[in-house]
Amino acid sequence: MESGPRVEPGPGAPAAVLARIPQEPRPSPEGDPSPPPPPTPMSALVPDTPPDTPPALKTATNPKQLPLEPGNPTGQISPQPAPPQEECPSSEAKSRGPTPTATGPREAKPSRRSSQPSPTTVPASDSPPAKQDVKKAGERHKLAKERREERAKYLAAKKAVWLEKEEKAKALREKQLQERRRRLEEQRLKAEQRRAALEERQRQKLEKNKERYEAAIQRSVKKTWAEIRQQRWSWAGALHHSSPGRKTSGSRCSVSAVNLPKHVDSIINKRLSKSSATLWNSPSRNRSLQLSAWESSIVDRLMTPTLSFLARSRSAVTLPRNGRDQGRGSGPGRRPTRARAGASLAPGPHPDRTHPSAAVPVCPRSASASPLTPCSAPRSAHRCTPSGERPERRKPGAGGSPALARRRLEATPVQKKEKKDKERENEKEKSALARERNLKKRQSLPASIRPRLSTGSELSPKSKARPSSPSTTWHRPASPCPSPGPGHALPPKPPSPRGTTASPKGRVRRKEEAKESPSPSGPEDKNHRKSRAAEEKEPAAPASPAPSPVPSPTPAQPQKEQSSTQIPAETAVPAVPAAPTAPPTAAPSVTPSKPMAGTTDREEATRLLAEKRRQAREQREREEQERKLQAERDKRMREEQLAREAEARAEREAEARRREEQEAREKAQAEQEEQERLQKQKEEAEARSREEAERQRQEREKHFQKEEQERQERRKRLEEIMKRTRKSEAAETKKQDAKETAANNSGPDPVKAVETRPSGLQKDSMQKEELAPQEPQWSLPSKEMPGSLVNGLQPLPAHQENGFSPKGTAGDKSLGRTAEGLLPFAEAEAFLKKAVVQPPQVTEVL
């Protein structure tokens, strides 16, 4: 492809410029006598020539003949190679044979006018056709240049399209790669999110499990602390250091575990992690009782009653009443009291102890002194009795308990040991903290409560010490164990009018409680606990400004049972001070408990109790009525709902049935219509088939009639032909018969005549065979030829084999008739005569 435009000689170029165009020498006519080959056509050299190019422009051009370059100052034409598109045809032309190359416009004329021979060559510089050839060559160069430019444009456009496609493909690949990377990134992010969510769920699950475990541990710790506190009630008294009771008593009754020296903690942790009842009731009692003297003294002091129990008991006056009630009502349902705890120091295991399932020992502390350590006189005035009355004190409680004690002793050793191990471990961990808490709780209220409860009697220090125990309002309601022990510890009072009236009242109360309670054994303990809780809630208001009673672990009972257990305990308060044998020091102790005990009138208490019971009964009746009404409303609503659902279901079923029936009817109607349509189609098809059969039958009849008619016509023609043939044959036979008769008469041998006869018959049969293909109807048996074939047999050979006939002349005639050929245009009379005669002859032969 050229780098710049080419200058082409115009039509008016001078001859000098044209002469300077390099020309190749032509072969001389002398050197090469053979004429030059014809020039190669332009179409073979220039394939891109448009079809509408004139013939003058399609002459052969030399690839070396190029236009002038603009940079050539001399005006010479520089050779330039042709484009590759134009070389291929030239190579094809070269392969065909040597072709003369056009060297300039001088040779263009001879190549164009090769068909016209010219004797002389005209010079190019002088003749005007040379100028025309130069002009045409310029036009050809111009067209070639245009074609090259178009080709270049086409290639450029093609290359641009190809580059555009490449760019599009590259962009598509980039887009696909980006999309793939994006999807991979999204998948990775989703996987990370799922993994993070899974880790978060696992972490939350672990946290929940951890919280649940911690909550379970805390609950177990709280339960353990509750058990520890309930157990420590039996030996960890809450008496203050400066309590006058310790100074006046001078005995071990007021000693508390909190007031022990520091070196005793290890012994308490090891030996006294449980209550005294559990300790004395353990299976290894013989081994555990082998203590040193100092340890035995500690155990004895812990086993003795303390004044903290009086603070928890609310009043020293109510204790004998509850004690007598417990003493009379002790049985299988009653828990063992502290009175038997004193006897447990005797040899042999004491049977009446805390039930193993209670998980806590006997909470209350007996008011009596230990048998080893008798109490002093001031304390025995209101708690103890002389040693001579102790056997009488133990008898009422021990009357109905040996069987229960044996059952408990048989069922408890393993459970007690397990509970002992568990509590020992918990005690080792929490004993120090428990002592500090108990000490703080015991020392929190004495200063504010003591002035309110102070009196002028000798027991006023004890009265001050009673509310000082924080377990009165804080820990006592949480104890699952009743406190019937003081009643057994106090000595029985001598019979008195008021005492005797109080006992039946207690019996009546116990009977009512037994009637109201669902179970025979457990409800009494529950009633005692409820009565204690109710007593503490009511009197605690003047003593403590803001007490926080701990809820009882037992399920809450109705208000009627609480009131029934509360009121008789309050009414029994004034009964004890009026006893004649009661010490005079017990009388002032009633005064601080009166404002806390409620009403002192028995009738008023009975009336209040009846009123409360009536209100509770009315409340229950109202609640029951409301429950019934609500149940009726719910039942009615349910019934209405069920009725509506049933109606809706029935409507749906009826609608479904109607739809099914309608569908069945429509289906049956459609089937009937289909059957009718099929039947109609079948009938129409049958009618059409009958019509077609009738038409075919008629056509067959017509065809048969036509054939019959044609047969009749053929028979008539045949009869006519036979008539004409038989007429001539009859004449010949007559002549021949005459000759034979003459010969017979002359005496020739008849056998010879018979032998000579078949030759003529054979000749006639051959003629008949030649005529048979022309008339195929003759070979078939028909009514026209009764003598030719009868039942498929030809009678002629039978006559020939026999050699004679019954009538010689007739037989010869019959043989001659059947064997001879048919002759056209003969008379018909002889044939008719023969036809009439022939059937009898055949019958005779057969």
Curated annotation (Swiss-Prot):
Positions bearing Phosphothreonine: 49, 53, 99, 120, 554, 818
Disulphide-bridged cysteine pairs: none
Residues where Phosphoserine is found: 95, 115, 118, 125, 127, 256, 275, 315, 368, 401, 444, 448, 454, 460, 479, 496, 544, 548, 552
Low complexity compositional bias, start-end: 113-123, 460-471, 568-579
One GO biological process term: microtubule cytoskeleton organization
Main location: cytoplasm
Entry coiled-coil feature ranges: 130-224, 414-443, 599-740
Subcellular location: Cytoplasm, Cytoskeleton, Spindle; Cytoplasm, Cytoskeleton; Cytoplasm, Cytoskeleton, Microtubule organizing center, Centrosome; Midbody
Chain positions covered by the region annotation Disordered: 1-153, 186-210, 318-816
Residue ranges with Pro residues bias: 24-41, 479-497, 542-556
GO cellular component: centrosome; cytoplasm; microtubule cytoskeleton; midbody; spindle
Keywords: Coiled coil, Cytoplasm, Cytoskeleton, Isopeptide bond, Phosphoprotein, Ubl conjugation
Keyword Phosphoprotein annotated: yes
Cross-link Glycyl lysine isopeptide (Lys-Gly) (interchain with G-Cter in SUMO2) placement: 462
Annotated Basic and acidic residues bias: 132-153, 407-437, 523-539, 600-740
Listed InterPro entries: MAP7_domain-containing, MAP7_fam
Highest taxon of source: Eukaryota
Pfam families to which the protein is assigned, alphabetical: MAP7
Similarity annotation: Belongs to the MAP7 family.
Biological function: Microtubule-stabilizing protein involved in the control of cell motility and neurite outgrowth. Facilitate microtubule stabilization through the maintenance of acetylated stable microtubules.
Name by which UniProt lists this protein: MAP7 domain-containing protein 1
Organism: Mus musculus (Mouse)
